[in-house]
């Protein structure tokens, strides 16, 4: 979930103007943008900057997602309440997994108290480190470093347990394997 706009940081790759024009050309009127920029959208000031830029340059509505943890490093949660006041519609560290269960649990608890949605990439980071694809025929034929589908399942199991504990609103981003479906069906 989310459009990768590279402002601030790497505007030459994708700007609010170019992303907005592409969306409008396809008949899309609203885009939701990710916080994985350089620097990350992890403070009200950074969010206000991108909001002003989007309003000035994008021909479509822009709804920003803010980072769940500072610099998307998984060590310290962001100011979720202040970021919501500044316009964040959800919180995510994108493809970075918040490995520390205590930090993730606290962030989910705080997000629940604010009514915020958390979007996470369920993955066991130890099993998925260095992988470029899910194990299988595609990865084997191309000689790609692969990760077991169980890494996604294990990450999702952890996230579901924390959601049950905290009652937070949660969206699992990038489910790529059927092995994760039993966990989703139970949830």
Question: Language-model features: where?
Answer:
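Active-site mouth loops of central-metabolism enzymes
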Residues: 1-14, 35-37, 63-76, 142-150
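Histidine/acidic residue-rich metal-binding segments in metalloenzymes
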Residues: 77-187
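Alpha-helix-loop-beta-strand connector modules within alpha/beta enzyme cores
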Residues: 44-65, 109-120
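Short coil/turn connectors at secondary-structure junctions
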Residues: 1, 26-29, 57-62, 85-88, ...
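Metal-associated gating/positioning segment near the N- to mid-region
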Residues: 1-57
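Hydrophobic faces of well-ordered beta-strands that scaffold small-molecule active sites
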Residues: 1-3, 31-33, 62-66, 90-93, ...
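Alpha-helix N-cap/helix-start motif
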Residues: 9, 40-43, 73-76, 100, ...
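Conserved short loop/turn motifs at secondary-structure junctions
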Residues: 35-40, 66-69, 95-97, 172-176
């Amino acid at each position: 979930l989310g459009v990768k706009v590279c402002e601030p940081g790497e505007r030459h790759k994708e700007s609010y103007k170019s992303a907005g024009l592409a969306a409008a050309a396809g008949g899309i009127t609203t885009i939701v943008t990710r916080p994985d920029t350089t620097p990350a959208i992890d403070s009200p000031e950074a969010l206000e900057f991108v909001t002003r830029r989007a309003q000035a340059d994008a021909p479509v509505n822009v709804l920003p997602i803010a980072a769940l943890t500072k610099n998307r490093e998984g060590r310290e949660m962001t100011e979720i309440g202040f970021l919501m006041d500044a316009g964040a519609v959800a919180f995510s560290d994108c493809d970075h997994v918040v490995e520390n269960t205590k930090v993730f649990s606290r962030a989910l608890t705080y997000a629940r108290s604010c009514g915020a949605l958390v979007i996470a990439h369920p993955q066991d980071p130890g099993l998925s480190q260095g992988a470029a694809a899910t194990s299988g025929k595609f990865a084997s034929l191309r000689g790609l470093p692969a990760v077991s589908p169980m890494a996604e399942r294990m990450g999702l199991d952890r996230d579901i347990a924390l959601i049950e504990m905290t009652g937070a609103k949660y969206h699992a981003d990038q489910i790529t394997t059927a092995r994760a479906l039993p966990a989703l069906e139970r949830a």
